[in-house]
From Swiss-Prot:
The gene is EIF4B1. It is found in: Nucleus. PANTHER family: EUKARYOTIC TRANSLATION INITIATION FACTOR 4B, EUKARYOTIC TRANSLATION INITIATION FACTOR 4B1. Coiled coil: none annotated. Homodimer. Nonspherical monomer. mRNA-discriminating component of initiation complexes. The keyword Electron transport does not apply. This is Eukaryotic translation initiation factor 4B1. Residues 105-120, 132-147, 193-217 have a biased composition (Gly residues). Its main location: nucleus. GO terms for cellular component: cytosol; nucleus. Residues 26-35, 237-247, 315-337 have a biased composition (Low complexity). It comes from Arabidopsis thaliana.
Length: 532
């Protein structure tokens, strides 16, 4: 009777179940062991708190303390080498033959390439570990790095922990067993890429690769002088190793220049400039100096004449009314610039255009700008008109009326006039000018007195004689009393029909000043205003 489970025994599934349970239990114990070896911070703190008191002190030797390796009693098992292994260890360097000691011979690893030191390094590595040579026989391919990669792999195991015999000891001359190179370029390309044999065989680290004896596919063991077989223009390869041997001068093509042609004739013709297809932005135009030189003219003289004309026109034309006459500095400057052939800058444009000063415009209109300015200044001064000013204005008006009447009917006036009165009528314009000057001087003096008068600052003991200072002055001119009165009226504070503080008796003013010596002018004014 055939079994449905394919021949599996009756208790096979039970065995498998038990085996699975055992594996799970082993995994659980491993997990707990890991957690015990690496507990959390809380568990470690709790464990130290509980077991800190019950923990006993342990004795250890000085060697154990210095090395840091403590072994429990009863567990001192020897892990080091046995006595037989210790006796097999080398006591010194291996004895080399005379041929191997010569640096120029092809006996050691890379002895001819890198000198004596390079060969020694290769020999030491071959003697120390057999992993450099690709498994001892050089049969299998290994990645770049040699035996260092074997330590990282867990599947591959070494044959023995003891050092294997080096291929450098087995082979005396690597040059006899090396394979011929296919081409020069391939050997140079594979120096670092690992296909043509730079420092080793194809694919291995520094040791053998591609079979054979010692990975000796390098041209360092074959050719002593690399410059002998060098080509003129080698093909540049895209690999990394080719950039070290190639140079820019080998790849660059040599320029083939035509020989220089020198004509036998005595006169050398100027070189013909090749015309380009790009159009000239100036067309057929040429410099002004070249054109004038072809016509036989001196362009320097022409420029100096033009500059002289410009300077004369600028100096002759007045820029404003104040500078109607040409200044000597400008004329001298224009002459010197014309002589020195210095290009003068363009004349500055007047920002005001054709605008003229106010005085010039008023004179063109027949007005006296001085009288207008005086009248404007007089309006700024706030003072009443004096009697003397009124009288002078009336006299000037009467004289002007007489002058107008004489100009309207001169014949009638001449018939009515007496023979002794001709001089008076002819002198009327001069008399009017004199009166106007007197009026102008008088108004200016009065305005200056009001404008530049000293403000009266009353001091203790001096207020008695201040009231009549302007009235007690002696004036030689008629109407001076009215002038002082008008001046006093301007200085008085304008009140609304109350008693004036400036006309108070001297005793009252003294009383105000003697009240407090600390109070000044403002305190006196405040007390005087109380009666307004």
């Amino acid at each position: 009777m055939s079994k449905a489970w394919g021949g599996i025994g009756i208790g096979a599934w039970a065995d498998e179940a038990e085996r699975a349970d055992e594996e799970q239990a082993a995994e659980a114990t491993a997990a707990t062991a890991d957690t015990q070896s690496f507990p959390s911070l809380r568990e470690a703190a709790a464990a130290t708190a509980t077991s800190g008191k019950s923990r006993k002190m342990k004795k250890m030797s000085l060697s154990e303390f210095t090395t840091g390796a403590y072994t429990a009693p009863g567990g001192r098992n020897s892990v080091g080498l046995t006595q037989q292994e210790i006796l097999q260890l080398p006591t010194g360097p291996r004895q080399r033959s005379e041929e191997e000691m010569q640096p120029g011979r092809l006996g050691g690893g890379f002895s001819s390439y890198g000198g004596r030191s390079g060969g020694r390094i290769g020999r030491d590595r071959d003697d120390s570990d057999g992993s450099w040579s690709g498994g001892g026989g050089g049969g299998g391919r290994r990645p770049y790095g040699g035996g260092f990669d074997d330590d990282r792999r867990g599947n591959q195991s070494r044959v023995s922990d003891f050092p294997q015999p080096s291929r450098a000891d087995e082979v005396d001359d690597w040059g006899k067993e090396k394979k011929p190179l296919p081409s020069f370029d391939q050997g140079r390309q594979g120096r670092y890429s690992g296909d043509g044999g730079g420092f080793g065989g194809g694919g291995s680290g520094f040791g053998g690769g591609g079979g054979g004896g010692g990975g000796g596919l390098s041209r360092a063991d074959d050719v002593d002088n690399w410059g002998a077989g060098k080509r003129q223009a080698p093909v540049r390869s895209s690999t990394f190793g080719s950039s070290f041997g190639d140079s820019g001068q080998e790849e660059r093509r040599r320029l083939v220049l035509e020989p220089r042609k020198v004509e036998s004739g005595g006169s050398e013709t100027p070189p013909v400039v090749e015309k380009t297809s790009k159009p000239n932005p100036f067309g057929a135009a040429r410099p002004r100096e070249d054109v004038l030189a072809e016509k036989g003219l001196d362009w320097k003289k022409i420029d100096s004449e033009i500059e002289a004309k410009k300077g004369s026109s600028q100096t002759s034309r007045p820029t404003s009314a104040h500078s109607s006459r040409p200044s000597s500095a400008q004329s001298n400057r224009s002459e010197s610039s014309g002589l020195n052939n210095v290009v003068k800058p363009r004349p500055k444009v007047n920002p005001f255009g054709d605008a003229k000063p106010r005085e010039v415009l008023l004179e063109e209109q027949g007005k006296d700008w001085r009288k207008m300015d005086l009248e404007l200044e007089h309006r700024r001064v706030d003072r009443p008109e004096t009697e003397e000013e009124k009288m002078l204005k009336e006299e000037i008006e009467e004289l002007r009326k007489k002058l107008e009447k004489e100009s309207v009917a001169p014949e009638i006036k001449e018939s009515d006039q007496e023979p002794g009165s001709n001089n008076n009528h002819n002198d009327l314009p001069e008399i009017i000018r004199g009166k106007e000057k007197d009026l102008e001087i008088l108004t200016r003096e009065l305005d200056d007195k009001v404008r530049f008068r000293q403000k009266p600052v009353e001091r203790p003991g001096s207020g008695a004689g201040r009231t009549g200072t302007y009235s007690e002055r002696t004036h030689s001119r008629a109407g001076s009393i009215d002038e002082t009165r008008s001046f006093e009226s301007t200085e008085r504070p304008r009140s609304r029909g109350a008693v004036d503080a400036w006309v108070r008796p001297a005793n009252e003013q003294r009383r105000n000043f003697q009240g407090t010596k600390e109070r000044g002018f403002f305190s006196n004014r405040s007390s005087s205003r109380e009666g307004w």
